[in-house]
Curated annotation (Swiss-Prot):
Keywords: Membrane, Photosynthesis, Photosystem II, Thylakoid, Transmembrane, Transmembrane helix. Loosely associated component of the core of photosystem II (PSII), it is not always seen in crystals. PSII is a light-driven water plastoquinone oxidoreductase, using light energy to abstract electrons from H(2)O, generating a proton gradient subsequently used for ATP formation. This is Photosystem II reaction center protein Y. It comes from Picosynechococcus sp. (strain ATCC 27264 / PCC 7002 / PR-6) (Agmenellum quadruplicatum). Pfam families: PsbY. One of its GO terms (cellular component) is plasma membrane-derived thylakoid membrane. The chain crosses the membrane at residues 5-23. PSII is composed of 1 copy each of membrane proteins PsbA, PsbB, PsbC, PsbD, PsbE, PsbF, PsbH, PsbI, PsbJ, PsbK, PsbL, PsbM, PsbT, PsbX, PsbY, PsbZ, Psb30/Ycf12, peripheral proteins PsbO, CyanoQ (PsbQ), PsbU, PsbV and a large number of cofactors. It forms dimeric complexes.
Length: 38
């Protein structure tokens, strides 16, 4: 595997995983809020 591929893909993978992490945290908070309001 060429090192240039790693250099190009690493920031994309990091950004994608960070976005998924933030979206999952927000979704869990919203689910908790919905459960407590019932």
């Amino acid at each position: 595997m060429d090192w240039r591929v790693v250099v190009v893909l690493a920031p994309v993978i990091i950004a994608g995983s960070w976005a998924i992490f933030n979206i999952a945290a927000a979704a869990l908070n919203q689910l908790r809020n919905m459960q407590t309001k019932k």
